[in-house]
Amino acid sequence: MAKFEIKDGVAIIPEGTGEIPNNAFFGCSSLTTVIIPESVTNIGCRAFDGCSSLTSVVIPESIKRIGSFAFYGCSSLTSVVIPKSVKIIGNNAFDGCSSLTSIVISEGVESIKGRAFFGCSSLTNIFIPKSVTSIGEAVFGGCTSLTSITVEDGNPIYDSRDNCNAIIETATNTLIKGCSSPTSITIPSSVTSIRQFAFSRCSLLTSVFIPKNVTSIGEAAFSGCDSLTSIVVEDGNPIYDSRDNCNAIIETATNTLIQGCSSPTPITIPSSVTSIGCGAFSGCYSLTSVVIPESVTSIEGHAFYGCSSLEIVHLSAGVSNLEIDSFKDCCNLKAICVPEDKVDYYKEHFPVDMHWLIVEDGSDLPVKA
């Protein structure tokens, strides 16, 4: 840091500087503007991490790599142009840049690492040039305002066929990232797989139709879609179904509910379901109550994680496997109602600070001591 200074909110980076080192301006909350000289070829890891007042940065065409977490948490940054000289955008490079409304990824960029633009909640559209041949996991996760995704024609690895507002891995027909809008999405019938977190936190999304050719859905593919009120799996799908109009995706062979909705509430879980899968209702923020039927024997980790409006849970006697974090961060829970002979059992499977919530069916709402 001795090499650089900040004057009147502007980072002073001398001509002739070859790189901006790791952590160079880490946490400099007074920094508002960065002008990088053309001698710089690399922006180091966490170079501008936590520069929460940074509103403007000009990245010259000399830069070849933007390091991991380079602009992490730069929550005042509104636009950025990635020049054609940049080959790699590092992991979490612009993660948490919540005011970022415009990103230009120039032809020449080859790799966008995992979570590079995660949580850019003001971003509305993305254009992926044909030079980009590697996109990491959850690159645009948490981009809740995203309404348009386009992959340039001629990209050898990815496409956005049928104007689907999504990024699809061409060779595998895997949908790796979708949009919040239009609110009712159309997944192309040629898609066979939906990647983990593909629609995570698409908060405007209200309905989903899963074509019969989709035979693989990654964990938390629709987590945090808190406006989602309708999920339908096309008849004839060999792996999944939405039996009994349940507004959920069920793995047919195992009777495992892998994705549910926030609404209607209370939700109705079919009596044929035997397991609530990992993260099945994670981020269903509008869900207020749930009844777990007698058929359910297993509730997996984070099944109801972060259901912040959930108040009442009815658990049956049949649950023999309950992960301790199944209802983690359900901050408004008022009662977990269980059969009389199961009170002690459930207290063994919930964290100590939730024991006061566990009451017999038919009892008054508990009061925390």
Regions found by a protein language model. Name each.
Residues 1-19, 29-42, 52-65, 75-88, ...:
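Structural signature of tandem-repeat unit edges
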Residues 24-26, 282, 349-352:
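Surface-exposed repetitive/solenoidal architectures
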Residues 324-325, 347-349:
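A short acidic (Asp/Glu
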